[in-house]
Amino acid sequence: MRLYFSAFRHPKRLGLCLLITLSIILLGWQCVLLYNHSPEIQRSVYTLTGLAPSSKMAFVTMLTVRAANGENEVENTQQDWYYNSTRLLVHRLVKFKPTKSKYPVVVLAMKGIDQWKLDQLQEDGAIVKVVDPLYAHEVVDDVNDIALLDSRWSMMFTKLRVFEMYEYDRICFLDSDILPIKKMDKVFDVHQLSYSKDSVLFPPTLFYKPRRSIFWRRFTEEFAAYGLTRDDLYPYVFAAVSDPGMWHETPPPFKDYFNAGLFVFKPLKAHYKRLMALARFPKLYDNANMMEQSLLNFAYNSAGAFPWESLDWTFNGLWARKNDLPYLKAVHGKHWQPEGSLGYDEDTSKLWWDAFQEMQTYHDQQRNADLY
């Protein structure tokens, strides 16, 4: 009340108060007008996922059959570093107290992996689910449309099997070369997105340029072509971390392209059906230059009908350097590789080897305890 009467005693103050009030009213009116006439803004209104306490969530990784010389070969020695890194990821999420999760860890194991490896992963505390591989020639209409197809990439579409895990309400997929260094459970705190049902600009048009072409082309989704309706596909969840690039600042600036080594999503039959339909045409997604990563970046393009949500960069420390480590919850890369390897960093490599040694010591102690 004192300020109110003071304003009347000072005309300049009264004028300033009226100007501020009028500005707030005009700004609010403009925001409402912009929202009502902008499907893009309506589409980006998020609501926190209201999951019940009984909701099933899980961390999921994948172990693939080793490939060499164009033929699948099962690695029979302990020097299979993809297997070792998978064990380390499981250990960090299941046993190691500083990073232990309250959620289960599932390993999607490609058919053909040695049984002793599967048994060991189960003994380590993982749920092991054997899946058939998805070969590129089974997914795409014409493998000649794929930019680079060799033995290393031929089975990468198998990662899409994770979208078939409908028994879970929310999944965080992690590549097996991710090393948690802090608690990761908050990665599930993502949003659920719905599209405005009365939008006249739905679905939006995307533009793509096939390799070796100088022309951009238009792509507008027709859900009926998948045998789906809009209501089948919404609401949905898909969140990932912006790819920082090998040389980046700390923290790295946002780029509208995510790394598919870690993503959080809600498994839906409709979305799996849509992904498999899009996957048939590599020209849509950079000729599958990065295989399933290229596909997912197209399917969840921020300008499309299903924009991806950006997770905090600390959940996926790709190309990590010393300056990044204090902030990260996980580092991502083949850090067991020697100096001189692509992306090698001395501090991150030491971090990985220390973690690997801790896991070995833990298992040695467990075996010794079993003798008594």
UniProtKB/Swiss-Prot annotation:
InterPro entries: GNT1/Glycosyltrans_8 (IPR050587), Nucleotide-diphossugar_trans (IPR029044). One of its GO terms (cellular component) is endoplasmic reticulum. The keyword Transferase does not apply. GO terms for biological process: meiotic cell cycle; protein N-linked glycosylation; protein O-linked glycosylation. Residues 1-34 form the signal peptide. The keyword Ligase does not apply. GO terms for molecular function: alpha-1,3-galactosyltransferase activity; glycosyltransferase activity. It is found in: Cytoplasm; Endoplasmic reticulum; Golgi apparatus. Coiled coil: none annotated. Keywords: Cytoplasm, Endoplasmic reticulum, Golgi apparatus, Meiosis, Signal. Has a role in meiosis. This is Meiotically up-regulated gene 136 protein. It comes from Schizosaccharomyces pombe (strain 972 / ATCC 24843) (Fission yeast).
